[in-house]
Curated annotation (Swiss-Prot):
Location relative to the cell: Cytoplasm, P-body
Segments forming domain Helicase C-terminal: 255-415
Protein name: Putative ATP-dependent RNA helicase ste13
Free-text comment about domains: The Q motif is unique to and characteristic of the DEAD box family of RNA helicases and controls ATP binding and hydrolysis.
SUPFAM superfamilies, per database record: P-loop containing nucleoside triphosphate hydrolases (SSF52540)
Biological processes per GO annotation: deadenylation-dependent decapping of nuclear-transcribed mRNA; mRNA processing; mRNA transport; negative regulation of translation; P-body assembly; stress granule assembly
CDD domains assigned to the protein according to its UniProt record, in alphabetical order: DEADc_DDX6, SF2_C_DEAD
Species of origin: Schizosaccharomyces pombe (strain 972 / ATCC 24843)
Binding site for ATP: 88-95
Length: 485
């Protein structure tokens, strides 16, 4: 009798689950092969965590199929309220690992701030807040993003309304808390993404001060790919018997193929031009070590005839936001940037990362190459090495326990390109510059290409801070999709 009743209940739950799944507008299934970085799980499902139906609907409609290893380890512990120290590779689903339990624990009947998600950069704050809104779109959860570079008055006005989750950067959040505008007295969930950066000497005093505004029974969760000694010091001082998760059996992503090329400084642009003509690039990010070199390289790339945006920390925040938004939406194939975008930025269409300037340390290298090969997919990382970089190359290989191979005469496209057939992955627009401009103007946005002005020869418009280049005598061309030899 008991067994029969149990069977009926299981069948009822299964039918109920399938019925609500059938009502959703789910994303097409991602057919690209994935590595063990995201597939090596115990086989649990999101339904096994007994999440609210509205949250499950948001998860499945966003295209999530089943938990990745970091989500599988983190979600049940976070739901229990225990402090967490989680270490996992870039691009394996860390953001959803803390966003899902944060959304689940929100009580929408209360008008108080219940979760703070702290991140080190403004771009990452915008991206994380969007994940919160996407997954929680059926839950009536109010999410607010606050960062430096925006008007403090606007944040104060928004905090007069109900806010359940705040996503922000340390300085601005502390400013709001210090002014008594943001009330964290009932905020029991404190999440730090890219915790190693947030606990660096420049941010640690701010974090320490910010914690004084939280209740004693708060839950603190730290997520990152790397944890230096300073994180342990913070953990010993502020975390209560944290549950430690370490999924870093190796530091680099399995799906990212790494090469280096010995190149004289004077030949770097020529080498980059060769790569653009040979590689099958969906979208690429090119890293430089200084903001000045970012703009100079973006100009050179445009003069070669390739579409290019640039972004760095000295640009106005509104321009940085526009560049990031347009690049993410595929308006342009190539983005030149400083280390501003090394952390957490998730653009699924990026399959090639190029270190035009080789990074000085292993941590920066790890975060840079992690912009490709997101969520177990394939990617390619190529580093230009000068004679002065050879010692850094050897040291980074030793610290990461990986071997960066010399670049071969030809690169097998299967290492970083999915032979998609009829399946469509996010790809950059192939429209002409005029069509892109028309589409942007229809949305009330200012275009980057063919904007009338007196600048010539690829010089930046608007004083150099717009983040895009044009040429006076020819249209920017989309390349990078040519077949490799």
């Amino acid at each position: 009798m008991a067994e029969s009743l149990i069977q009926k209940l299981e069948n009822a739950n299964l039918n109920d689950r399938e019925s609500f799944k059938g009502q959703m507008k789910a994303q097409p299934v991602d057919m690209r092969p994935k590595t063990e970085d995201v597939t090596k799980t115990r086989g649990t499902e999101f339904e096994d965590y007994y999440l609210k139906r509205e949250l499950l609907m948001g998860i499945f409609e966003a295209g999530f199929e089943r938990p990745s290893p970091i989500q599988e380890e983190s979600i049940p512990i976070a739901l229990s309220g225990r402090d967490i120290l989680a270490r996992a590779k870039n691009g394996t689903g860390k953001t959803a690992a803390f966003v899902i339990p944060s959304l689940e624990k929100v009580d929408t009947k209360k008008s108080k701030i219940q979760t703070l998600i702290l991140v080190p950069t403004r771009e990452l704050a915008l991206q994380t807040s969007q994940v919160c809104k996407t997954l929680g779109k059926h839950m009536n959860v109010k999410v607010m993003v606050t960062t430096g570079g925006t008007t403090l008055r606007d944040d104060i006005i928004r905090l007069n309304d109900t806010v359940h989750i705040v996503v922000g950067t340390p300085g601005r959040v502390l400013d709001l808390a210090g002014k008594g505008v943001a009330d964290f007295s009932e905020c029991t969930t404190f999440v730090m993404d890219e915790a190693d950066k947030l606990l660096s000497p420049e941010f640690t005093p701010i974090i320490e001060q910010l914690l004084s505004y939280f209740p004693k029974n708060r839950q603190i969760s730290l997520y990152s790919a790397t944890f230096p000694l300073i994180v342990k010091n913070f953990m010993d001082k502020h975390l209560n018997k944290p549950y430690e998760i370490n999924l870093m059996d190796e530091l680099t992503l399995r799906g990212v193929t790494q090469y280096y090329a010995f190149v004289d400084e004077s030949q770097k642009v020529h080498c980059l031009n060769t790569l653009f003509s040979k590689l099958q690039i969906n979208q690429s990010i090119i890293f430089c070590n200084s903001t000045n070199r970012v703009e100079l390289l973006a100009k050179k790339i445009t003069e070669l005839g390739y579409s290019c945006f640039y972004s760095h920390a000295k640009m106005l925040q509104s321009h940085r936001n526009r560049v990031f938004h347009n690049f993410r939406n595929g308006v342009c194939r190539n983005l030149v940037c400083s280390d501003l975008l090394t952390r957490g930025i998730d653009i699924q269409a990026v399959n090639v990362v190029i270190n035009f300037d080789f990074p000085k340390n292993a941590e920066t290298y790890l975060h840079r190459i992690g912009r490709s090969g997101r969520f177990g997919h394939r990617g390619l990382a190529i580093s230009f090495i000068s004679w002065a970089d050879r010692f850094n190359l050897y040291r980074i290989e030793n610290e990461l326990g990986t071997e960066i191979q010399p670049i071969p005469p030809s690169i097998d496209p299967s290492l970083y390109v999915f032979p998609n057939g009829d399946y469509q992955i996010p790809r950059p627009l192939t429209a002409s510059a005029d069509q892109v401009l028309a589409a942007q103007q229809a949305k009330g946005q200012e275009g980057y290409h063919n904007r009338p002005n007196n600048n010539r020869g690829g010089h930046p418009r608007g004083g150099g801070n717009r983040g895009g280049y044009r040429q006076s005598n020819r249209q920017p061309r989309y390349r990078g999709q040519q077949k490799a030899d």
